[in-house]
Amino acid sequence: MPCVADWLNNPFSIVQGIFAQNTPNSDWEKKVTDYFKEKLKENNATNWVPSLNDVPVHYLKPNSLVKFRCMVQDMFDPEFYMGVYETVDPNTNARVLHFGKYRDVAECGPQQEIDMNSSQTVTLERQTFYCVPVPGESAWVKEYLFSLQARVSPSTSYTPSRHKRSYEEDEDMEQHPSKQKEQHMGSGGDSHGCGEPKRLETEASAGHHLISPNCSPPLDLNFPLPGEKGPACLVKVYESWDTFKVNDVLEVYGILSVDPVLSIVNSEERDSSMLDPMECMDTAEEQRVHSPPSSLVPRIHVILAHKLQHLNPLLPACLNEEESKTFVSNFMSELSPVRAELLGFLTHALLGDSLAAEYLILHLISTVYARRDVLPLGKFTVNLSGCPRNSIFTEHIYRIIQQLVPASYRLQMTIENMNHSRFIPRKDYTANRLVSGILQLASNTSLVIDETQLEQGQLDTKGVHNVKALGNLITWQKVDYDFSYHQMEFPCNINVLITSEGRSLLPSDCQVQLQPQIIPPNMEEYMNSLLTAVLPSVLNKFRIYLSLLRLLDYSISDEVTKAVEEDFVEMRKNDPESITADDLHRTLLVARFLSLSAGQTTLSRERWLRAKQLEALRKARLQQQKCVNGNEL
């Protein structure tokens, strides 16, 4: 039986063995995926696999098994490759079948040639995803995943060397600026006993060629959020690629390809003019974007991939499995004290305002659970008004949210940002790629919009479009990507919290006026002491609590539905002027999240009454503030 080092360090040997034992027309490909699926089910086996998120690519062994936790930022056109091909020895006429799956270049021995006219050749199709690390992923998520990796990963899983010779070859071929080389040093690949002149590309022109122009400007890795770091990868998917879509978060396991020969092949192909220019329709920019140097954007040939149900690594990946059900039931049994502690923690963060803390909890566990026509059900955008202007208070509130959720981003709503930032992803037809924007986020990302930063000024056309995009995101939970000739709707599920001085310029589902009970003499010191006072184990319980409750099912019995309807009719009768259908909808939302926050998956009469009470208190505050200001909030 193969040892750990075989399937981790040399997965090609496993694939070759399975391929050799089965005829190409059999289900050898399924046997390969089944083999690795079983291997990864072994105790802690997934943690043995080196992660591109944690280990620099130049420390990873080429053609070894790696994993990558990522978001699909773009999908390129499908490409053709030689799934099976035949080599022939000109001297002995001996023929050998090879597999081309999981490879960028076809392999053949020093005395072999590929028979391009062989009847055994099988041309297949694969899909390429351009993947980036999860935008706005919290530091605690990265640290937790890295701690698992460092604790379990055996020393055989990767080689801590830079493969210096291969890198220098790659460096000469790519001719990228020195700064970029230092940041993204990559490793070369082994030749597998095959001289470079004998190596041929397995890709045909099904949309693009692997060409990397010389002397090109630094490569834009196309991260949605400014200041993001980490690897971008071309992820080659062979099975069930139609089950994935743009913005999905995936965990992929596959074979790492960082072979500098890709640059050789592509440069020679471009310079030798072997291809008819009429047949090569790709622009230089498209070739550069779709076939970047492998040292900068490595390739992963996927053996297994699955879409993540949530972003929190403290929870089991799939909550439907038996072990996961035990985890959930154990946590639910201690839910009440966790909620009480979280409420106390957020109350202190919100300067003693327990009502605002209640609504913040409801906001943080909200999620779009369904869509009725165009209406997203379950969104709960909260506008926290009454925040001090130009204060570090809103910055620290965001830092606290960062410590609680797996992914987040703080958008400072300044005139400068609104007029100059790219919010909406757009299609670049010259490079044939989707250029990312700030609003290209993974599902359940927390977006905190800080309106206290807004000063007087003039929005230009781009600024107006950006404000409109934020409004559409909040109201419809969708972003209209710009495809020049038309707009394409991309549904999303983003938790939006707006912090503002007065009522927000943006729409919201619920406005909560902050009423501080304490004014700390030193706000920074006060906020910092909050986080240092919380034990890491307690913080982890808060994180599990907020992620888990989003995933619970919820229902309202016929009996309670009838009682709610009767109650609403009575409310309208008593106050026909101010009670509207929107009030009913909002109170039902509050009741939903209030029930879930207590671990109850059905609405009770008590929770309905508590929701009405919270709403009455919230409205009374707004009315009080309106009277103080003498105008509409």
Swiss-Prot record:
Cell division keyword on record: yes
GO cellular component entries: nucleus
Sorted UniProt keywords: Cell cycle, Cell division, DNA replication, Mitosis, Nucleus
Record field: compositional bias (Basic and acidic residues): 174-184
Subcellular location, principal: nucleus
BP GO terms, sorted: cell division; DNA-templated DNA replication; sister chromatid cohesion
Annotated region (Disordered), positions in chain: 154-198
MF GO annotations: chromatin binding
Pfam families to which the protein is assigned, alphabetical: MCM_bind (PF09739)
Cellular compartments annotated: Nucleus
Annotated family: Belongs to the MCMBP family.
Subunit structure, interactors included: Interacts with the MCM complex: associates with the MCM3-7 complex which lacks MCM2, while it does not interact with the MCM complex when MCM2 is present (MCM2-7 complex).
Function: Associated component of the MCM complex that acts as a regulator of DNA replication. Binds to the MCM complex during late S phase and promotes the disassembly of the MCM complex from chromatin, thereby acting as a key regulator of pre-replication complex (pre-RC) unloading from replicated DNA. Can dissociate the MCM complex without addition of ATP; probably acts by destabilizing interactions of each individual subunits of the MCM complex. Required for sister chromatid cohesion.
Identification of the protein by name: Mini-chromosome maintenance complex-binding protein
Species in which this protein is naturally found: Gallus gallus (Chicken)
